[in-house]
Amino acid sequence: MKYMGLNDIRESYLSFFEKKEHLRLPSFSLIPKNDKSLLLINAGMAPLKPYFTGLQTPPKTRVTTCQKCIRTGDIENIGKTSRHGTFFEMLGNFSFGDYFKEEVISWAWEYITEVLKFPKDRIYITIYLDDDEAFKIWTEKAGVDPSRIFRFGKEDNFWEHGSGPCGPCSEMHFDRREKPDLIKTREKFIELQDKDEVIEFWNLVFTQFDKDEDGNYNKLKNPNIDTGMGLERIATIMQNTDSIFEIDTIREVLDAVCKICNVKYGENHKNDVSLRIITDHIRSVTFMISDGILPSNEGRGYVLRRLLRRAARHGKTLGIEKTFLCGLCDVVIKNSKGAYKELEEKQDYIKNVIEIEEKRFDETLDSGMEILKNYIDELSLENKKVMSGEKAFRLYDTYGFPVELTQEILEEKGIEIDMNDFHSEMEKQKNRARDAREESNYMGKEIKLIDKLPESVTTKFVGYNSTSTDSKVEVLIKDDEFVSTINEGESGIVVTEETPFYAEMGGQIGDKGIIFGKNGEAKVVDCKNNISGKIIHIVQVVKGSIEKNENVTLEVNYKKRKDICKNHTATHMLQAALKKVVGSHINQSGSYVDNERLRFDFTHFTALTDEEILKVEAMVNDEIMAAYDVKTDIMSVDEAKKTGAMALFDEKYGNRVRVVSVGDFSRELCGGTHVNNSGEIGLFKIISESGVAAGIRRIEAITGKEAVRYTEENDNLIRNIEQELKCSKKDILNKINQYHSELKEKEKEINILKGKLASGFEENILSSVKEVSGVKYVASEVKGISGDTLRELCDKVRNKIDDGMVLLASKDGEKVQFVAMASKNAVKKGVHCGKVIKEVASMCGGNGGGRPDMAQAGGKDGEKLETALKEVGNIMEKLVK
């Protein structure tokens, strides 16, 4: 067994199974497609579920992949051990009703012993208790010594999760001991497994049963094979190391971290944990961003933010003061670009996203850490070991601290978070709630009836050239059951042999319209694809009934379709204009097209200037006025790329693609509907440009009559402003600037008067100074001033009383503003403005806090202000030492 690099192992595995007539598929995106049960792809078979369930037809019955995966279930332990990571690659070979146990076992043995040349006396096999068939193949076909095969129960060697496809599995294990002797008993085998001296490296799943709701195991007509071998795990064996962080490609990343922070790996346990966390997380972060995931406060974007900020925080603990993670991703990309070409194609984009997020975290880290330190000090003073969830949520919501990061920091101090309280706060902000999980079985989410349409059902789209056609009803579904009739007043699903209705896809909404037959009429409220691409019409029967097998006429709402076409073609032209005006780095990140407007999300890191927006808009309108023919051509993907056609990075295209061209101005791969000539769009108007995430901008625009209406409304608004300001259009800005100048002068005069008013309060306030245990304090209401003036007055009074605390309050209707300040000596004696003001504000229905020497707060119930101010003395007595 010779040393083998990680990249070489990957290639040898995939090449081996290509020779066994497997189709090598590229890794699927980390973002699951049509599977809400998963946040991120976490297993090699996960993207292949539709093939295993029969919902989609695989491109070949034999497939092999190396799938990028992410698991974050035990993220808090990542770095503490040297064996686990959040990012990993899973090698797999799969059969969809083709070969079964004999072939997969024989090939697994051949690859391990003849290609990788594992010593046979270090290999052990586990099988399911009564899987005699697998035992026979291992011993008779592969020639494995029966004493090296152990049988285990369902917990270890049977793959199932709820109902659905399942089956026994067989695992291959490697004995890592320096001088291995034959393991003779199951007990000894388990003992060595627990010590990680015997490790599992390949799992062969024989999916031969379908478990029903009653728990019965029914034999599948066409059994499948699902295998998984962790690339990093097999690399540790081939490179004779116990740690994934010692593997060639990963060690190179770790060494780069060491170089940045000038720390040597292996000399200090705490430093080693931080080094491993950064090394692991930058790999996950790089691949996630490459697949289109961006930092956010929900879903997979939250996972990314959590990983990125955890890595950045551990960089600080190693003494790294500058942003550094974007540089590390260069090392990740260098080592992985051979297998994942998209990494190099998007390298600048990935680095920009990382740098922006790291800088944002850097900006809030110091203030957030200061707040957290205050919380920890408060808990220490009160001798408490549990921090409220409300405080943890504030750090999360205001300072971008993932709660797990706060937990990690607090754990070092022996403090916990009240997570029930935290989740309660999270629930209050539903717009930031995590993605809800759906109940799922082994193959993912519960399969809906629309995804179980018989293979004989075909739906042909004929809507590129027509908005009306006659066809036959193939399937009717109502209340998730196949039916023969849908009656007036009922809703359901209609599937026909042919349809002119475009099904929602690629950002374009589904068509609306009507379906009518001899006995009734149905309104089509939406049109979608099921998981296998069959077109389904979601309908409401408004007259009579629609029956299965009857001939019907399908008519798309022509006006809505035409407006959708205008907006879709305009979206293509917008992207082309953005690339020309802003830069070639612009790529589509998302889009939405309906009959009223269009929305286009694209990769860019700063807001567009007014000049850029005007240039883009003018360019699109120039091309509209040029009245180019819009052409569509069908060609191979390679041919399309040679023409310069734009495509989405994460989209999987078939062998033949549809290319839509607007003259020579725009050329894109697209399956949507478009105008025949750019002149049909009429007018294009950008109505907004904004940021939606780090590195993602959004343009919203309108076309045709909507754009004309919008322009007319703006003209009317300008006319009204002219009348109000009594000036012409060209003088509006001058008039507004004049009013601004006058307003500023008035504000200056008001502030001078407020200052004089505040000075008049000083004497009254100073006359009411009291004392607690040698510390002076004053709590007073002042009328008619607020904001900066109130703070300035508080500061003056504090300086006048020399050694003490001042709390001032001002009412505006029922609202109350509080400011408190204390001298250094008063703080040393126990005064804490943040604690004082928090209690006082809470009595007035408000909240707030701050530092020991300065704090601010607000209240909602002004009637209770007098009572609250009287309590300041009692609060001071509790604090002063």
Curated annotation (Swiss-Prot):
Record organism: Clostridium acetobutylicum (strain ATCC 824 / DSM 792 / JCM 1419 / IAM 19013 / LMG 5710 / NBRC 13948 / NRRL B-527 / VKM B-1787 / 2291 / W)
- Superkingdom classification of source: Bacteria
Q: Tell me the name of the encoding gene.
A: alaS
> PANTHER family, from UniProt?
ALANINE--TRNA LIGASE, CYTOPLASMIC (PTHR11777:SF9), ALANYL-TRNA SYNTHETASE (PTHR11777)
Spell out the subcellular localization from the entry. Cytoplasm
Name used for this protein in its record? Alanine--tRNA ligase
Q: Does the keyword Ribonucleoprotein apply?
A: no
PROSITE patterns from the entry?
A: AA_TRNA_LIGASE_II_ALA (PS50860)
Q: Which InterPro entries match?
A: aa-tRNA-synth_II/BPL/LPL, Ala-tRNA-lgiase_IIc, Ala-tRNA-ligase_IIc_anticod-bd, Ala-tRNA-synth_IIc_core, Ala-tRNA-synth_IIc_N, Ala-tRNA_ligase, Ala_tRNA_ligase_euk/bac, DHHA1_dom
Cofactor(s) needed: Zn(2+)
**Chain positions recorded as Zn(2+) binding sites:** 568, 572, 670, 674
Query: Which SUPFAM superfamilies does the annotation name?
Result: Class II aaRS and biotin synthetases (SSF55681), Putative anticodon-binding domain of alanyl-tRNA synthetase (AlaRS) (SSF101353), ThrRS/AlaRS common domain (SSF55186), Translation proteins (SSF50447)
Segment forming the signal sequence = none
Question: So what family is this one in?
Answer: Belongs to the class-II aminoacyl-tRNA synthetase family.
